[in-house]
Every structure is written in C-alpha cells, then in structure tokens.
C-alpha cells in the first residue's frame, strides 16, 4: 500500500518551502493543500490543534508539525535517497544548531523590514544584515552549508531567498552588496529541481507584501 502524504501549506511560507523541498529531494509524491491562514480549515485545526499553523505534514493520517522536525522525519522515513542530515553525530549536531539559529533569528528581523517603520524598521534591517553575514561566514567558500552536499541547513534557509528581493525593495538596500557569497549560494540552490519547483517567483512575493500588511492591519506610509 502506497504512503498517503498530505501537506497543509501556504504558498509564500518559507517554512512550508522547506518541507516541499525535502519531499521533492526524496521524490515523495504528496497532496499539496493550500490553506487560508485567515480562515483556518477544519483539517488544519484538527491536525495542529496546539499551534494551528502551517506547514503540517500528514503521513498516513498522522500529523507532523514544525518544518525542521518535518525535514528530519522525511529524512528518516525515506532514507534511500541522498540523506538530508549528516550521519556523523557532530556534523549532525552542527547542522541542527544552524537550523535552530535560522529559525530563531532570521524571520523575526526580516519581518521588521516589511512590517515596521522608523527606528524599528532600521533596527530590524541592521540585525537582518548582521545575521546574514554570520550565516555567510559559516558558509565560507563551500558550495553548500554541508560542503559539497545540499542538505538540512540549505533547506532551512533557502525559502528566505525567495523573499530577498522583497526585503531589498521594502528595505531599500542590497543583500548582494552585503553578502555576495550568500547570494551566489542561493543561485546555486535554485538550480536544483527540488528548489526551483518549491520556491515562488520573487515578483509574486513583492506583490503579496502589501496584501499581507493589509491583512495584518499594518499601516506604513
């Protein structure tokens, strides 16, 4: 009997993009179900009653929540394809450290670029650039964060890359000028079929931001 895999997601979510990419990397067929986050569906509320957030991966009726946990789950359930996490315990721990760093740091500062104004906006932009520089330092001259192999940390971060042009537009700055190696890394990642299929067009994200502000009641002149 074939596995039933359902993904409850929202197209601009950089967290959902992670799960899409992980599934694509493993060639796992899945039923993508777009969610309205302002009118949450019964299945989303049933499958993630604690946080009521996307993405939710449903495997044979069992929900798995939180995107980084989903990447690990996918890697363990479908191990035959190229592993997403290193087998070495230390390298695995390091990958998880950087995944956690991305989760805790990147979104919070990036959100201030399009969702705040004045001093808060400028502080968010400054912190965001500093965070990207920290990540660029970890990347160094490697092809991917894990070396020559695309994996966990790349998947954790690459969804934000689809938002980079929006951050630049609403923040009036150039990420490439600040972090050229990180931009080169993003371009390499997008050449992968799994990433290209999973990331939305940057222009679509830019057009979505004013709509998102309106939905959230954010007024920025």
From Swiss-Prot:
Q: What EC number(s) does this enzyme carry? A: 2.5.1.18
Q: Which Cys pairs does UniProt list as disulfide-bonded?
A: none
For this chain, one GO molecular function annotation is:
glutathione transferase activity
Gene3D superfamilies from the entry?
A: 1.20.1050.10, Glutaredoxin (3.40.30.10)
Q: Which InterPro entries match?
A: Glutathione-S-Trfase_C-like, Glutathione-S-Trfase_C_sf, Glutathione_S-Trfase_N, GST_C_Tau, Omega/Tau-like, Thioredoxin-like_sf
Q: Work out whether the entry's keyword set contains Cytoplasm.
A: yes
Modification type N-acetylalanine: residues: 2
Q: Cellular component per GO?
A: cytoplasm; cytosol
Chain positions recorded as glutathione binding sites: 13-14, 39-40, 53-54, 66-67
- A GO term (biological process) for this protein? 2,4,6-trinitrotoluene catabolic process
Places the protein is found: Cytoplasm, Cytosol
Q: Where is the GST C-terminal domain positioned along the sequence?
A: 88-208
Q: Which residues form the GST N-terminal domain?
A: 3-82
Keywords noted in UniProt? Acetylation, Cytoplasm, Detoxification, Phosphoprotein, Transferase
Cytoplasm among keywords = yes
- Locate the Phosphothreonine modifications and list their residues: 149
Which protein family is it in?
Answer: Belongs to the GST superfamily. Tau family.
Q: What is this protein called?
A: Glutathione S-transferase U25
Tell me what organism the protein belongs to: Arabidopsis thaliana (Mouse-ear cress)
Q: What gene makes this protein?
A: GSTU25
């Amino acid at each position: 009997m074939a596995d039933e895999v359902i993904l409850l997601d929202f197209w601009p979510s950089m967290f959902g993009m992670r799960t899409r990419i992980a599934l694509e990397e493993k060639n796992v067929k899945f039923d993508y179900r777009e969610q309205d986050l302002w009118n949450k569906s019964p299945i989303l509320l049933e499958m993630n009653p604690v946080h009521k957030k996307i993405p939710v991966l449903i495997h044979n009726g069992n929900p798995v929540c939180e995107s980084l946990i989903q990447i690990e789950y996918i890697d363990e359930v479908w191990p035959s394809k190229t592993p997403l996490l290193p087998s070495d315990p230390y390298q695995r721990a390091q990958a998880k450290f950087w995944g956690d760093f991305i989760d805790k740091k990147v979104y919070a500062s990036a959100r201030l670029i399009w969702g705040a104004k004045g001093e808060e906006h400028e502080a968010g932009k400054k912190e965001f650039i500093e965070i990207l520089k920290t990540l660029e330092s970890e990347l160094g001259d490697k092809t991917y964060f894990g070396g020559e192999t695309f994996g966990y940390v790349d998947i954790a971060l690459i969804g934000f890359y689809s938002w980079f042009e929006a951050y630049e537009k609403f923040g009036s700055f150039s990420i490439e000028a600040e972090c050229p190696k990180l931009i080169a890394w993003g371009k390499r990642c997008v050449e992968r079929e799994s990433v290209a299929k999973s990331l939305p067009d940057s222009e679509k994200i830019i057009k979505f931001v004013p709509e998102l502000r309106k939905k959230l009641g954010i007024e920025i002149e």
